[in-house]
Swiss-Prot record:
Transmembrane region(s): 8-28
Designated name of the protein: Photosystem II reaction center protein J
Entry's family note: Belongs to the PsbJ family.
Pfam families, alphabetized: PsbJ (PF01788)
């Protein structure tokens, strides 16, 4: 039980951490493309 909870697969961490990162990058590029990011 401790082995499964203590050792999380890297693809699970990458997926959970990757989704918000991709979302933030998408919002950043969309904002810079539409002109909102140029003022930052």
């Amino acid at each position: 039980m401790a082995d499964t909870t203590g050792r999380i697969p890297l693809w699970v961490i990458g997926t959970v951490a990757g989704i918000p990162v991709i979302g933030l990058i998408g919002i950043f590029f969309y904002g810079s493309y539409s002109g909102l990011g140029s003022s930052l």
